[in-house]
């Protein structure tokens, strides 16, 4: 069966089982450096602050736990400096706050949003995750959208090796070009730093004799700088988004790459991911070949990434990859997922060419737990590699639960599922089964947006989702109402129908026998 293709690496948080949080009284909100918000006080608090930063987190999230002390420290520094910036947090895993989670598009943890003008202007946070970096980033967000550069020293300090930087060069700070530059700077300031100058000679790269107006984009990758003279607002935004994105994204521990990774995994293009040890003697050859592949296949709607296996634990766990297969090239596309393990640098381009031209001849990769050697419990264990045998091709009526080990509702339902399985274990035409959706690819026949998700596949081939009460009585009733004929019964009926039809045809076509004596 085809599998769901996950093009966003940010894992969706599915069903909350946390206890309800206690609301924060508005008079008590200023006693802590980081304000605690929930559905009860969120709108009131956000509305009265011109600049508030909100962290959406989950109590169990490791990255949230790492960020928490840095976020608290940053809040304390900002308060002591009397900057008009407030830091707050929301437990987005709490069911009470689900509406806030959905409203602000929280699909991974932590997610940080900058809310200005009482919440009317909401933007993503694109800055560092340590206290000093958070403070400096937010200071820039409070100040002017673009800063004026007046010396080579200022330019060197602001531009060199500072990520993606935009500098507008203008003969005078007026006119349509300058105004549009400032509008775009205000709109995109959360993700990029903007500067302007009237003297291109102070800039560290590019033609220093230009008078402008031009926009020069500096970046620490690819061609290092790019110029544009198109000051239409839409054109300027597109120039920044395209030129400011690496030809090959790097997956490593560098926090400046986080925003590139988020965009990489959220775009609908196919993904080609090369994972290798950055300590490998051949690393420069691998980098050269993946960049050459990105140039060669730029028109094939493929986004490219190179990752250090030392920092890729989450990726490997999520996609079910093995470190023993490194160096590996992994492709995710609408047609499936494809893996080329233990490869050499000079195999990258030929294999990608084969994928593009002959992908139908490549065996798709499916993430699956091992098939259980023993599967004799009342609740059968289904994995990606045996779902066809147990569910689709068994000829039986199968109730299948998709669950996650961390899901509290799933743990409660496990007892009920066991009760159902024991009650029906003498019925040879019914199978009660479960599948861990976090470590197995789920066929596209199923829509799993939360855990637990329950489906029923009848012996006659009907697939139904179960949305009723999670009680043994209700589910058993649902199974009996929707079950198909017993295994072999349909075939027997078919065979008898065919025999009857043949007999009828023979009888009707035989000429009457005349008795002559």
From Swiss-Prot:
A motif (Prevents secretion from ER) lies at residues 514-517. It comes from the Eukaryota. The record marks 470 as: Lowers pKa of C-terminal Cys of second active site. The active site is at 61 (nucleophile), 64 (nucleophile), 407 (nucleophile), 410 (nucleophile). Residues 1-23 form the signal peptide. Gene3D superfamilies: Glutaredoxin. It is an enzyme of class 5 (isomerase). Glycans are attached at residues 41, 301. It catalyses: Catalyzes the rearrangement of -S-S- bonds in proteins. Disulfide bonds join 61-64, 407-410. Acts as a protein-folding catalyst that interacts with nascent polypeptides to catalyze the formation, isomerization, and reduction or oxidation of disulfide bonds. May play a role in storage protein biogenesis. Belongs to the protein disulfide isomerase family. This is Protein disulfide isomerase-like 1-2. It comes from Oryza sativa subsp. japonica (Rice).
